[in-house]
């Protein structure tokens, strides 16, 4: 979906199921723009990362990051080979030594808003809205997305925001 969006002339279609990272207001259950902490919400409750089919939380974001810290080189999830390390490597700026920066502290979960601001160029909803005049016609009929209403990793929330945005853009006659 991201490749189709960023390179609409190069690809002739995308078929996406439970797409990751389409709107960073819901990066799973983290709003990277507003939240202060990735591990706990504004009420002090642990943020779930993965849920079972019945909705029961299997593990939290904090637990997942702690596990990735354990398997990562230098005790950092950035080197774990896991999803969280991968997203930081792709979306975030690099440090002077080439190491990917982390959007949040790997031990406390405190979000670094200066890094979050640099992720915005990879927020597909924001990018699509900003570039809709030229992008809309190029994407016509090319994005094929399927999403259930209860994704295990809470990806459906971001997709709902993306869908609402697309409906608004299309209703303004900018198809």
Language model features: what each stretch is:
Residues 1-175:
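Non-catalytic cap/lid and distal C-terminal segments of serine-dependent acyl enzymes
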């Amino acid at each position: 979906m991201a490749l189709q969006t960023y390179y609409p002339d190069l690809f002739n279609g995308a078929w996406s199921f439970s797409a990751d990272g389409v709107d960073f207001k819901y990066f799973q259950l983290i709003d990277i723009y507003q939240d202060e902490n990735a591990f706990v919400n504004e009420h002090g409750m642990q943020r779930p990362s993965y849920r079972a089919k019945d909705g029961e939380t299997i593990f939290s974001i904090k637990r997942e990051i702690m596990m990735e810290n354990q398997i990562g080189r230098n005790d950092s999830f950035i080197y774990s080979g896991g999803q969280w390390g991968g997203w930081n490597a792709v979306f975030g700026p690099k440090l002077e030594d080439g190491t990917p920066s982390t959007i949040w502290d790997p031990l406390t979960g405190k979000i670094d808003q200066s890094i979050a601001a640099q992720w915005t160029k990879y927020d597909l909803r924001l990018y699509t809205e900003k570039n809709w005049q030229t992008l809309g016609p190029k994407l016509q009929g090319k994005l094929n997305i399927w999403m259930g209403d209860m994704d295990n990793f809470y990806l459906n929330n971001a997709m709902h925001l993306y869908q609402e945005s697309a409906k608004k853009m299309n209703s303004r006659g900018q198809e």
